[in-house]
Structures are given as C-alpha cells and as structure tokens.
Amino acid sequence: AGALSNLDAKARLPWFGPTMSARSFATARLMETWAHGQDIFDLLSVRRKNSARLKHIAHLGVTTYEWTFKNRGLSAPLPIPYVCLQGPSGEAWSWGVSSSVDLVTGMAEDFCLVVTKRQHCLDTQLQMMGSAIAWLPLAQCFAGPPVDSPAPRGKLV
C-alpha cells in the first residue's frame, strides 16, 4: 500500500490483461484478498461480516461488464444494466442509468460472490432482467482467461 500511495491514482500499471490505473490495481488486490478470504470462510463454514469496503469490489464487478464479454470473444449486450445493490449496513449503492428493463438488484454480498466466481448467480437472491441475464452467469471481475461460474446448487439463501 505504501508504494501505491505515492502514485497518481490514474497512473497506468502493467498487469495480466490490459493495463490498470493505480486505483483499479489497488481495488483489484482488495478484491482478490476478499475473494480468497471468502474461500477460507466457506471452508470453515463461518459467516463473514462484511463492511462498506465491499462497495469497491461491487464497483469493480460493474466496471468489468464489457470486459467480461470481450474476454470470451463476445459482444456485450447493450445497454449496460443498471445495478442497484444493498450494502452491508442497508445503504443503497447504484451504477448506471436507472432502468426497469436492464437491471440487477439485490444484496451487494451476493453480487460480489458472483463477480468473483465464488457463487453462481442462480444460488443468490439477485434479481436480473434484460441484458443482466446474459451477463451475470459470465461476470468475472478479475484478469486472466475466462473462468466459468460454479455450477448452480439450488438456492442456498
């Protein structure tokens, strides 16, 4: 974190896949730590208490919408869905243009579990409409080759 704090937030850094801004680089490291930490919580069957920092991971999940499709050699369906999530303390977080046709709504934790490939979207309480139906099963907020979602296991929540 010390080295990153000395960089301009918009400075481009090389990484796997496209270059990233220093801010996105730091967010991606937070996402990786959270996602792999979730693997440990799941292994131990312990429920995690999330904080407002989850918003950074949700933001990364939203901003990688088009990249998710490009990474698979597909064209992203437009428009980009409106995403409205409830944070851990009940606050509303939203991205995009409000729409009743192309949207994702639900808990931020569910969304973050989906975009980090920890859970299939059908195993959450996320509501999807329009272009979000094609997106969420593929959604991937990390660099590298496409990774498939875990197989749906039926509603867990």
Language-model segments: residues:
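Structured surface interface patches that mediate subunit assembly and partner/cofactor docking
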Residues: G2-V157
